[in-house]
Amino acid sequence: DLMNDLMSLGIHRIWKEQFLDWMAPRETHHLLDLAGGTGDIGLNFLKRGGGITTIADLNFKMLSTGQKKITNKKFNQRLNWINCNGEKLPFNDEEFDLVSISFGLRNVTEKDVALGEIYRVLKKGGRFMCLEFSKVNISSLSVLYRFWSNNVIPFLGEKVSGNRKNYEYLIESIK
């Protein structure tokens, strides 16, 4: 979470708020948040009045970290944490009103398979929402973005988390 703030200068929080606005959570909605990590999207979905959230991630450690940060115990009844692969979802057909993935689709090996699984588990009329990085098309910003991405983010990764390579991979995965 700290690294997300540092890497994006806090802008990721604005993106996520807008993402949740577009979701328009309702009490009757069941959300599947893929690559849900520590639960930022899923927990905020509940705080905004969503019904049930299932947070799914391949990384068990991220899910465990997310479970520890829950301060509102009433959410436990409406929250599921599932360690699974987005390319082979362990859910019934047409189970979810919404499926979201934020900053995770670029890490999926077989995107077409994962998108097929998302379609399978979405209810008819359900919505898939994806928040992801993309190329910067404004040339003046592009120069700054490349400098920040190639120099500052790996440096921050090394100083804050002790792992420069993970953040070099992150930048490559965005390209």
Annotate each PLM feature.
Residues 57-60, 110, 133:
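Short beta->alpha hinge that forms the Motif I/post-I loop of the SAM-binding pocket
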Residues 30-88:
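Class I SAM-dependent methyltransferase SAM/SAH-binding core
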